[in-house]
Design a protein with these regions (language model features):
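Single conserved hydrophobic/aromatic residue that forms the stacking wall/gate
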Residues: 1-12
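Alpha-helical transmembrane segments of integral membrane proteins
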Residues: 15-234
Length: 234
């Protein structure tokens, strides 16, 4: 029996009910889960920064429209909005990433917008305007680098959030298709009470890996915040 043939000392050689090596699936599934989490965080940051920088600098009707759209997305609980969009678009890896980007750009937009609102009154920005530089050059070449510190921290936190969301959706069978190994899909077997009670190696190691990885990502975010925020430095 592939489920009971090995002892505790051979945890890393354990297999699931179909004979697939659990350790290998955790490693390969980690690549997919990290790709989803980090890719979604970076792309949602690109969208949020692009819109937030321009809207925060220019103001006017562009800022009003972008702000209202972001408020619409942020007014719904994210998990409910994700479930609704998954039911409409269907299950696939890239559909899930697109949904994460669509529901996650608002927070980055508001952060970038707030930084631009504070920076656009700085003297160096007034000087750049007097030189006749274009809006694009002022926003994205000169102002954006001064706003990157909180943005980098937010990207790390978004990565952890998207990985946890993917794991939760895949555990419920609503995330990435089950034929693609992800940490959430590996956890999916724990829906069976028999597996949950008797075959801990099929879900326990991946649960620990998810927890440790998310904790490490959050530590990286805390370190970036402490190193870039002068108020956190002694």
């Amino acid at each position: 029996d592939v489920l009971t043939s090995r002892g505790l000392g051979d945890v890393y050689k354990r297999q699931d009910s179909t004979g697939r090596d659990v350790f290998t699936r955790v490693l390969f599934g980690g690549r997919v889960s990290i790709f989803i989490g980090l890719g979604s965080a970076i792309l949602s940051a690109v969208v949020g920064i692009a819109v937030g920088c321009y809207a925060g600098y220019k103001g006017g009707w562009v800022d009003v429209i972008a702000l209202r759209i972001s408020e619409i997305f942020m007014s719904f609980p994210q998990i409910i909005l994700v479930l609704l969009l998954v039911s409409i678009t269907g299950q696939s890896l890239f559909n899930l990433m697109a949904i994460f980007i669509l529901t996650g750009w608002g927070g980055m937009y508001r952060l970038a917008r707030a930084r631009m609102l504070s920076l656009r009154e700085e003297e160096y920005v007034q000087a750049l305007r007097s030189f006749g530089l274009s809006t694009f050059t002022i926003c994205y070449k000169h102002m954006l680098p001064n706003a990157l510190s909180p943005i980098m921290v937010n990207i790390t936190l978004s990565t952890a959030m998207f990985i946890l969301t993917e794991a939760g959706l895949s555990f419920l069978g609503l995330g990435v298709p089950l034929n693609i190994p992800t940490w959430g899909n590996i956890l999916n077997v724990a829906q069976d009470i028999l597996v949950l009670q008797n075959y801990w190696w099929m879900w326990g190691p991946v649960g620990i890996v998810i927890s440790v990885f998310v904790l490490c990502v959050n530590f990286i975010g805390d370190g970036l915040r402490d190193s870039t925020d002068p108020s956190q430095q002694g």
